[in-house]
């Protein structure tokens, strides 16, 4: 008799996606981040749902409702900090997942890669709108500064900004719509994930060597499910440690001051996971140029498959490309640091140098080094 998981209309979809899915036998821990992102998304949706039951999206009461959640709701403080720090874990896993894709050449699965870029944009939009909801100083001024960037778009810019604001400044209408979109977007992200996975399963997973592994496949369950569970435990331990020992480590103290349109904070900055893009934005003196550079800092991932010049897929056997990759990682850390610093010497020139290097490495140096490595293969 055939097992029910192979015949039941719903169970067979789950079976083919998680149980009997053929996977390369050589997958390292870098392949854990997809499942970790799934757990992060689940944690965020659940904690967010319970927070939404107590939150009020009104400028007069939003800040107080967050205080009420932390002080008066049973385990409200835990929900709030799990949600805030869960976002940080989400982005750590996201950036490591993208970095894995770049290092091992997973971007050659173009459909999966492009849907992944859409997912990245959707998660970034969700996180930005979520940062506005507590209605602290950094929430208000962050929303004002970032939405104002759209005014750099020629002809329609000013009208577009006022349309998003729902008035002539960030106010009650803005907060209400941001809450609505912040609630809606995670479900759109979930839908995109459900498109991301079938495209991946259509081609099968890449592996660290970058060599086709069709003759050497194993079942996902139990081999990789056990490995994923270990990943869950490590990540959830890290998240629990952050939430219980230092919940405000990654937040901004200014967000504990209620939003005041009459007092500008001395240094407006987004959450840490956007600082690299914020540094690229600030490094260009022209407003429209800065906005274009900001968008391109993420959108550049879409042209990475076109720039792949190497005869080998993975960087595992390409030491010169490896050096460039880790230089790129160092540049991103530098940009993250610069994004959190005031706009003054020497931070301005460091930011401009790092921004130039970021685009230079991806657009020119990586393809050139790949061609050099191709030539060296002949020796």
UniProtKB/Swiss-Prot annotation:
It comes from the Eukaryota. Binds 2 heme b groups non-covalently. Heme 1 (or BL or b562) is low-potential and absorbs at about 562 nm, and heme 2 (or BH or b566) is high-potential and absorbs at about 566 nm. Heme b b562 binds at residues 83, 182. Pfam families: Cytochrom_B_C, Cytochrome_B. This is Cytochrome b. The gene is MT-CYB. Its main location: mitochondrion. GO terms for biological process: mitochondrial electron transport, ubiquinol to cytochrome c. It is a multi-pass membrane protein. Component of the ubiquinol-cytochrome c reductase complex (complex III or cytochrome b-c1 complex) that is part of the mitochondrial respiratory chain. The b-c1 complex mediates electron transfer from ubiquinol to cytochrome c. Contributes to the generation of a proton gradient across the mitochondrial membrane that is then used for ATP synthesis. It is found in: Mitochondrion inner membrane. InterPro entries: Cyt_b/b6_C, Cyt_b/b6_C_sf, Cyt_b/b6_N, Cytb/b6-like_sf, Cytochrome_b, Cytochrome_b_C_euk/bac, Cytochrome_b_N_euk/bac, Di-haem_cyt_TM. GO terms for molecular function: metal ion binding; ubiquinol-cytochrome-c reductase activity. The cytochrome bc1 complex contains 11 subunits: 3 respiratory subunits (MT-CYB, CYC1 and UQCRFS1), 2 core proteins (UQCRC1 and UQCRC2) and 6 low-molecular weight proteins (UQCRH/QCR6, UQCRB/QCR7, UQCRQ/QCR8, UQCR10/QCR9, UQCR11/QCR10 and a cleavage product of UQCRFS1). This cytochrome bc1 complex then forms a dimer. Its cofactor is heme b. Heme b b566 binds at residues 97, 196. The keyword Zinc does not apply.
